[in-house]
Structures are given as structure tokens and as C-alpha cells.
């Protein structure tokens, strides 16, 4: 099954603010969510247990960036993309 990937406008702004190389790396990893957005053996995707009824996934990208996303039926909604440092500051306990 292929998934449609939708990216929040703020996440797009962040991606566009990166260097060409970083932008290509981020885009490549986000496009890979079309094929398989669920956590697996690679360890780059993780289901976060925040609270009941909230299902958020985290994608580590090249040890430099983190994307947070949700999956609804056949659509992946990328809500945020940020540096790993920003993610650690914003989501300390995850």
C-alpha cells in the first residue's frame, strides 16, 4: 500500500530554509514514508506514547533532523520538522 504524504506549511518553511544538501536528505526521507511510515527494524521511526488516543510517530533523519507525523488511513501528515537539538528542547521526555 502506498501512502500520500502531506507536509504542514511550517514544516515546508523549515525544510526550505536548509542548505541544498540538507533539504535533499530531508525530502528523500519524507518521500520514503510513502512506502512504509510504520516503525520497523531500522530504528529510524518510532511510535511515541504521549497519551491515550494520540498516535504520533517520530522519524530521525540523518542524525541531524527529526520529523513528527501522524498516520490516518492512507495519508501521512508531517506536522513538524526540526533539528534534533530543537526536538530535544521541545519534547524533553520523549
Indicate where each model-derived feature is located.
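Extreme N-terminus of proteins, especially the signal/transit-peptide cleavage junction
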Residues: 1-3, 53, 94
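Generic surface-pattern signal
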Residues: 20, 31, 35-38, 92-93
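Arg/Lys-rich, positively charged N-terminal/basic patches that mediate binding to nucleic acids
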Residues: 1-31
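A short, surface-exposed loop/turn module that caps and links secondary-structure elements
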Residues: 32-59
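Enriched for short, Lys/Arg-rich terminal
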Residues: 13, 24, 61-94
